[in-house]
């Protein structure tokens, strides 16, 4: 049995965590098993599922709890656990690439950096320190890692430009189980009934962690503008996070409590997307979000900020809009874009584009076993 160590912050239901779990579910676990090395406390949404699939989950203290303790924990871990065929480090920046250093020290042959973002959150504490560290660590990339992956051209440029390895970096698609998202009228009716959504209601959908970069606060402004001409418009928000209370307060201040649905963290995103009429993502920046791939698989038209990678438009159903435009402009575009797009079946198109999880698994397995 070969084992691969997946390295990330935690196993909450976010984009990169969902990507890793999609791969884990689809990979032949009789041949390759995953373990997880995390820096966040136990209790992530995916932890029990990962354990049930055969994973060991290990925890080390995060770097912000003490630099020396962090490095000692990494050294101790890899001195005892160095029989992996590969480590797969999922990162949003190069601020913390030390696991790969210790993996190399203890002889793990395949060491992967995987870029899932295209910038650093400006709301992040000590943002400027993270940015400086990101660029200071670029000269180390070629010696720490053996493979350089990313979810989009923007994510690849952000992580590997000026490192000397950009030409070697590979795009790995955020593959999903496409059939699971295929439009189903029966499920749509069930979900709408569950949340008290009328047949004639117009539902704007969004899936994402409640953090500043996702910009859910702007979605509330958009809904407020839509209500000027369409009182039946509703906002379906899937996820939770640090800014959730702020969003709920804004919803209350605008008197939109009956028009905004907070589902919390859900494991049935494919099902919830059936109830939506359009998917909107006004993020300040992204790599290539898994949720945008999921929305296209569900046949939803998408309006997204132009800070998101244009690589994400796999079906010709995404309208990119400037994040600097007003909520009024966004609301008009949402209505116009919905009118121009029906509810197409995009499954085969996504598969041809290489966004089926089986295709992604094949690519990663070849990297894990050293064929690439």
Pin down the residues of each PLM region.
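A short, active-site helix/loop in glycosyltransferases that binds the activated sugar's phosphate group
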Residues: 141-182
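A short helix/loop element that forms part of the nucleotide-sugar donor recognition site in Leloir-type
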Residues: 74, 182-197
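N-terminal strand-loop element at the rim of the active site
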Residues: 6-72, 242-244, 367
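Short hydrophobic beta-strand element within catalytic cores of glycosyltransferases
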Residues: 37-38, 301-305
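Active-site donor-binding acidic/aromatic loop of nucleotide-activated sugar
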Residues: 243-246, 257-266, 272
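A conserved mid-protein helix/loop that constitutes part of the nucleotide-sugar donor-binding site
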Residues: 17-22, 202, 206-225, 242-248
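Aromatic "clamp/platform" in nucleotide-sugar-dependent glycosyltransferases that forms part
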Residues: 92, 265, 284
